[in-house]
Amino acid sequence: MRVILSGGGTGGHIYPALALAEVIKQHEPDAEFLYVGSERGVEANIVPKTGMAFKQLAVQGFSRSLSLHNIKTVQLFLKAVKVSKKIIKEFKPDVVIGTGGYVAGAVVYAAQRMNIPTVIHEQNSVAGVTNKFLARGATKIGVAFEVAKQQFPSEKVVLVGNPRAQQVAQLKSTFSWQTIGLRDDKATVLIFGGSQGAPAINLAVIDAIPEFNERSYQVVIVTGPKRYDNVLDLLRERNIEAADNIRILPYIDNMPNVLKQTDAIVSRAGATSIAEITALGIPSILIPSLHVTGDHQTKNAQSLVDVGAAINITESDLNGQSLIAAVDTLLLDENVSDKMAAQATKVGMPDAGERLYQLILQAMANKKD
């Protein structure tokens, strides 16, 4: 089996593709992969480290206003399609899979023009621009949220979940809180604003630390590497010291390992976070980012709130007191946390990679028919 994967720009498009590749390898050890990414996206740093063959295309997104930028965007897209056709001709894939981002638009569109089976995967509750564009020509479409199905042709779309969920669920964690000086027998909340950190979350945490110091549970705060020094500076300016039950870290290398030992999480509501949280059945406090296309994080969060699997705090309502109140609700009331964990588990799809793999086989079978 020969597979071209394409997705780029953010980790939310890349990690599901890499997780899917792991599942395919489990079924087909001789499978060969080629990942086609963008020159500017983070995939250029992430994919080569996995040992997967990697090629780059020059693409860029559209501006909301009419401009010369958009003319160049179209020119780059057409050139990227031409280069993609050459790559496809040389690699001879059985299927081409797109997981979002502008680069996937060029690669999957080229494959569609060459009559090669294509599968696209939508991680969010609101379909992205690229996947909307590719939907008509796609052989099959997998989505991570039930609500996303209505945005695609009904005869093609299947609810499969996010392959990242299966990757996390299958992981055997050896992590201990003792490695950062905490105890394994105490309830622990992880507060994480994403790989770059979230200033709004960090500021709320700073306000909350004096009260967190008095709690029986443990608090692990991940600031983001670029914001770590700023958080420490603000704590010093305000004469706030963190007690022994609190740890402040710039980043965590292996988040899935840590999540398996976490009793509650405070995070943004990105697709990857939602997949991980539900796969592991972790009660969560979600603070959707306002700076995303189509406000999809709010809708992602609402999908968990609606089934009682999460608490949602809007950024405008986020402060030290609202954060403490929400964490107390999860970690000081076992009935609440147990119910939320059960509901998160119900909506989680720990076999998402397997579901998407089966959809890919269907797409390939359609071609043979």
From Swiss-Prot:
Subcellular location field: Cell membrane
GO cellular component: plasma membrane
One Pfam assignment: Glyco_tran_28_C
Database matches in InterPro entries: GlcNAc_MurG (IPR006009), Glyco_trans_28_C (IPR007235), GlycoTrans_28_N (IPR004276)
Binding site for UDP-N-acetyl-alpha-D-glucosamine: T10, G11, G12, N124, S195, I252, Q297
Gene Ontology biological-process entries: carbohydrate metabolic process; cell division; cell wall organization; lipid glycosylation; peptidoglycan biosynthetic process; regulation of cell shape
Membrane topology of this protein: Peripheral membrane protein
Pathway(s) this gene product operates in, as recorded in its UniProt entry: Cell wall biogenesis; peptidoglycan biosynthesis
Top EC category: transferase
GO molecular function: undecaprenyldiphospho-muramoylpentapeptide beta-N-acetylglucosaminyltransferase activity
S-S pairs: none
Hydrolase listed as a keyword: no
Protein keywords: Cell cycle, Cell division, Cell membrane, Cell shape, Cell wall biogenesis/degradation, Glycosyltransferase, Membrane, Peptidoglycan synthesis, Transferase
Source domain of life: Bacteria
CDD domains found in the cross-reference section: GT28_MurG
UniProt entry tagged with the keyword Glycosyltransferase: yes
Family in the record: Belongs to the glycosyltransferase 28 family. MurG subfamily.
Function: Cell wall formation. Catalyzes the transfer of a GlcNAc subunit on undecaprenyl-pyrophosphoryl-MurNAc-pentapeptide (lipid intermediate I) to form undecaprenyl-pyrophosphoryl-MurNAc-(pentapeptide)GlcNAc (lipid intermediate II).
Name recorded for this polypeptide: UDP-N-acetylglucosamine--N-acetylmuramyl-(pentapeptide) pyrophosphoryl-undecaprenol N-acetylglucosamine transferase
Species annotation: Leuconostoc citreum (strain KM20)
Gene this chain is encoded by: murG
